Design a protein with these regions (language model features):
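Short conserved micro-motifs at the rims of enzyme active sites and ligand-binding pockets
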Residues: 10, 17, 165, 185, ...
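Residues that flank catalytic or metal-binding motifs in active/ligand-binding sites
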Residues: 148-150, 170, 188
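Short linear, low-complexity motifs centered on an aromatic residue
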Residues: 183-196
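Bacterial Sec-dependent N-terminal signal peptides
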Residues: 1-26
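Extended serine/threonine-enriched, polar tracts that run as long, contiguous segments within proteins
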Residues: 166, 171-186
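A domain-level signal for the mature, folded cores of soluble proteins
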Residues: 19-163, 194-274
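Assembly/interface hotspot detector across virion components, adhesins/toxins, and nucleic-acid enzymes
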Residues: 3, 126, 175-177
């Protein structure tokens, strides 16, 4: 028995001091021991149409300047272990090919190929000689990058699941909104069918301001709604955005957004009142 205990003590001692940390690990624990990589997407819970007793659709805007939303924006320059959500999506479309459902609008009608996406992200301006247009004086390449992203827009369905007795949301689409570095125009680059983007978002980590050990993926941040957003449109018979009927009144637009959120909360609370 003493021999067995001595052997176990020796093995534990070797294991403790056998942990080799190199400068490449850049931390207290070897990167090989840190389980950052994720290989699968957590599937949505099964939802029957009969269990979905009520639903509505919202369009929301996530401003990346807000502190809570910083994990979706930074780092603007990719780091060895993480990159911004914009770079994750861009690489997944252009390089990895894991995101294929890319469209021009939120109705998902006008499909974009990777080549067309690249032409949107990288614009080439040619300066020609006014006297002889055949002579090219200069070629300027303008590329949209992470620092140009000012917000993200998401399209999601809210529904009450009577089987589970809870209000849930499911993201349908997501779109980066940029400010053009040349013209200062603000516009949506493209819309992505969100279920098609989950694989790329679930295999890339974001910064967790609460605990650096427990890293979160971009998919987890979006699914848990670990962000602050403003509703700018609710599904309606006129298909209008809030700014269409609250023109030039930013304060009233914010109040309307708040009213829509409170209406959603009150509906859920009303179901539990007897």
């Amino acid at each position: 028995m003493k021999k067995i205990l001595s052997l176990l003590t020796l093995v534990l001692t070797v294991a403790t001091y056998g942990q080799v940390i190199t400068p490449e690990d850049d931390g207290l624990i070897p990167k090989s021991d840190i389980h950052y990589s994720n290989t699968r997407v957590v599937p949505y819970p099964f939802l029957r149409q009969d269990d979905m007793m009520w639903s509505t659709r919202h369009w929301e805007r996530i401003h990346v300047q807000e502190k809570l939303n910083h994990p979706l924006y930074y780092p603007v320059v990719p780091l060895p272990d993480r990159k911004s959500m914009f770079d994750v999506i861009k690489d997944a479309i252009l390089t990895e090919g894991t995101i294929q459902e890319v469209y021009r609008d939120d109705r998902f009608e006008l499909f974009l190929t990777p080549t067309e996406v690249y032409q949107i992200l990288v614009r080439v301006d040619t300066l020609r000689d006014p006297d002889d247009p055949s002579i090219i004086l200069a070629v300027d390449s303008i590329e949209l990058k992470s620092p140009n992203v000012i917000s993200w827009e998401i399209k999601s369905d809210w529904y009450f699941d009577k089987q589970r007795g809870e209000m849930k949301s499911r993201i349908i689409g997501i779109s980066p909104v940029v400010k053009d570095p040349q013209t200062s125009e603000i516009y949506n680059i493209f819309w992505i069918w969100f279920p098609d983007a989950r694989q790329a978002l679930a295999t890339n980590i974001a910064y967790n301001p609460d605990n650096n050990v427990k890293r979160l993926t971009f998919d987890q941040i979006l699914q848990m709604r670990y962000f602050n957003a403003v509703v700018f449109k609710e599904e309606n018979v006129y298909d209008r955005m809030i700014q269409d009927y609250k023109q030039n009144r930013p304060m009233e637009q914010l109040l309307e957004s708040k009213r829509i959120r409170e209406e959603l909360r009150d509906y859920e609370h009303g179901l539990w009142q007897f």
